[in-house]
Amino acid sequence: MSGSRRITVAVGVLMFVDASLYLAVLPLLPHYVHRFDLSTLGAGVVIAAYPVSVPVVSIGCIALVPRLGARRITLASAALMTVATVIFAWAPSALVLVLARFVQGLASGSIWTASMAWVTENAPLGHRGRESGIVTGMLSAGSVMGPAIGALAGWAGQGIAFGLVAVVALLGVLLSYRAPAGRDAVASGRVWDGLVASARQPATGAALAIAVVDLLAFGAVDLLVPLRLGSLGHSVAQIGIALAIGAVLGAAVGPLAGRLVDRLGAPVVGSSAAACTVVIPLVLALEPSAAVQFGVLVAGGPLFAIVGAAMFPLSSAGADAAGVSHVTATGLMGAVWAGGFTIVPLLVGTLAQAASTQAAYVVILLLCLPAFILLRRRVRIIPRLAAADAGPGT
């Protein structure tokens, strides 16, 4: 196995753990409410403790990766996630549970930023899409396992279920240790200057626009569609099966989407995926049948895999064009992504409660449209990414 592929596999395993930990807690919320006497707000704190720190960590990694190296930060993050998962598994109180989940989120932020930069900095020339697709495919596989881990924890106990996740996280530590350091990220001067320089590039702007469309649409879908299906009498198991099918499809589509990105270009693939995503809130605002809403849940997995396969090569191409390290672009992406997935469910929930579900979808659609228009404008002026991808890594 080549050095670059060892990096990709190591990061993919950590992304698998990250996705499974984020989603595993959802089926367990009723258990935590009963065991720790939590209010609805307290249950919300358990969920929010994971992503709340990611934007700050992502920006911090931009300064730290050039100094310490992406591999070292990945190793430290993987070790931190392993320890936090063990503590989470046997948390004796709600406070320990929330703190352990907060630490898992700290590790998640640096994995998304430093580790993805490690992948794109060292991907073979012309194959960033392929390597990014492999990672997002493994992320989708983690999304499959998350609800299953939660179900196992409810049946066999948290110690066994999350202990198994900790073992996989430890495997990620070992794989990261054995992977080569690869190219070192070059310091880009002041963090803010690097962020601005990267954000001004058309490719980075396109990547950010794709991310915004995705997090707006699926931030709404993740909250409102399961609630709607539940109100129509469909079981948790049926909803979980639909999500699992989507995640399985995402795991299969990820590598294929990466190869498509390398062949057709990230702008073409990314803008096509974003166009499909923009349609989703429009369709859901029309109150379609349950079958259509189940279809949306299934479509989420492969659509996310395609988005990820295009988004990371776009952001790294923008970093190359700006003359900054890839971690600058991935840090910016991570901050936007995590911030969006923290804010959007709160916004959508407030709108749905104050007005209606249809009104919430209409607002999301209206927010998606400017991002999609910006994407189309950026795509028109992006130089052919194959040329950017073939350039020297920074």
List where the protein language model places each region.
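Intracellular juxtamembrane helix-capping segments at the cytosolic ends
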Residues: 111-123, 307-321
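Conserved MFS/SLC helix-loop-helix module at the cytosolic interface between two early adjacent transmembrane helices
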Residues: 56-92, 261-264
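Cytoplasmic helix-loop-helix junction between adjacent transmembrane helices
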Residues: 100-139
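Helix-loop-helix hairpin linking two adjacent transmembrane segments in secondary transporters
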Residues: 134-177
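Paired small-residue
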Residues: 84, 95-103, 291-300
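Helix-breaking motifs and short loop linkers at transmembrane-helix boundaries and internal kinks
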Residues: 37, 69, 90-95, 233, ...
